[in-house]
Amino acid sequence: MLVISNLFKKSSKSRKVRCEICANYCKIADGAYGICKQHKNINGELFDESFGIVSSLNADPIEKKPLYHFLPGTLTYSVGGFGCNMGCLHCQNYMISKEFDKISDRLNILPETIVENAISQGCKSIAWTYNEPTIHLPFNKKTSLLGRRKNLKIIYVSNGYMSSQALSEILEFVDAFNICLLYTSPSPRDGATS
């Protein structure tokens, strides 16, 4: 499903757009994708092509996220997508983050279904995990806001490489973060090798 992103700027001189979801700030030509391979420039508009497409759905102990002091002893409904805004050589989820075009098993799911699944499996929260959730912001936000209305807490397991605009939106619906510190360097682009 194609969904237009609200976090991009149009170029006044060309059909390029600048994605403002993550800190890569990809400049994307018409018909091309950003680093995450989830956002495409179509005629000068930025579209998220991954809305409702997930790689994984599991009820996990919250300690697997790992969070130890947030809802201890409960289950969280873990949801993963495809793609990533980094290119870590040691990625434990490489197939869903970088080689996902080779995976034919893709789940199309509605935000309401994720919330219903979480509740029916006895989960107290939804965790956006397995790949970088920030690149799926429109879907995650819609699902999370529905979940919060049903008293589910929201968890983001992230590399933290997001724009301040995206962070502002995420803070509207996230209750707990696990920021996986992957790399540090004086140069911000050193950690994103793609």
Across the structure, where does each feature detected by a protein language model lie?
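N-terminal juxtadomain amphipathic helix
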Residues: 2-74
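Conserved Radical SAM active-site core
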Residues: 41-177
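Conserved small/polar residues in nucleotide/adenosyl-binding loops
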Residues: 183-190
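Catalytic-face loop-and-helix region of soluble metabolic enzyme cores
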Residues: 180
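Disulfide-bonded cysteines in secreted/extracellular proteins and peptides
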Residues: 19-22, 26, 36, 84, ...
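N-terminal low-complexity segments that are often proline-rich with Ser/Thr-Pro
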Residues: 192-194
